[in-house]
Amino acid sequence: MLNEHGRRLLLGPTTQRRRLRQILDREDCVTMATIFDPVSARLAEQLGYEAGLMGGSLASYAVLGAPDLIVLTLTELAEQVHRCTRVSDVPLVVDGDHGYGNALSVMRTVHELDRAGAAAVTIEDTLLPRPYGSSGKPALVSFDEAVARVEAAVAARGDSDLLVLGRTSAATLNGIEDAVARFKAFEAAGVDAIFLPGPQQREQIDAISDAVKVPLLMAGAPEALCDPAYLATRRVKAWSAGHQTFSVALKALHDSMQLVRSGTLSLHLPGQASKQLLEQATGVPEYDEWTRQYLAGGA
């Protein structure tokens, strides 16, 4: 909807956050869109997604063309989040990684992502970035530090509607007992929901769902677990099987560039977006209205 000046009326961060909270109160499980830039954010809204997920890997790919090794800065992440939230009403769950440092850094991370318009921020207890001399195997910070990080994240919210999600990979790295203990401690620290990355078995999801009362969100799982009906029974309210849509887009770009490099005329490339889709994805109708109102002069 446009206002009298031709500006599309966005709901604003608080309303988006309340929409996400409403999703967490429902009985079903929604699929989150992969969002990594303003175009994907607009498409997610136009296609009717109720929530989106910006993974740390996606942000690093889109902003730096770099792998997910914590070389992206907090400033760069917050800027990319804002670019997405300023054009779309889809509530955005943002991967805050380890919070870019200790508990004080976590507070700064939550503050900046709050200002950028994130609907929810995940904070994890993985030891990041990879320390010197490590074998490359992921490791977790201590139990006490993990809880302190989450407590700091909850305290740092400027808007009480911003959701803080506690995340740990303990089920994969240390076993389900440690994962359950950490998630229960995160719940006691005040998180709004648990974010479960990469579960491999239903038994893991069942154990965590039985141990906590707050809702669950999930991302990355084998095909056997990609069953929204089952996930809904375990109080998983939003999920993503992975970021394969980014992979598909990358392959399409690679293949089309390869065809042009080999002599195909770009006009003849297969699979091109229609003019209408391109204009919808880039906000052309809105800009056309502004142009008519403010650049036409006396014509």
UniProtKB/Swiss-Prot annotation:
Textual note on the cofactor? Binds 1 Mg(2+) ion per subunit.
Binding residue positions for substrate: 57, 167, 243
What cofactor(s) does the depicted protein rely on?
Mg(2+)
Q: Which major enzyme category is it?
A: lyase
Which residues are listed for Mg(2+) binding in this entry? Answer: 95
The UniProt similarity line reads:
Belongs to the isocitrate lyase/PEP mutase superfamily. Oxaloacetate decarboxylase family.
Q: What is its EC number?
A: 4.1.1.112
Q: Mention one GO molecular function.
A: oxaloacetate decarboxylase activity
This protein's name: Oxaloacetate decarboxylase
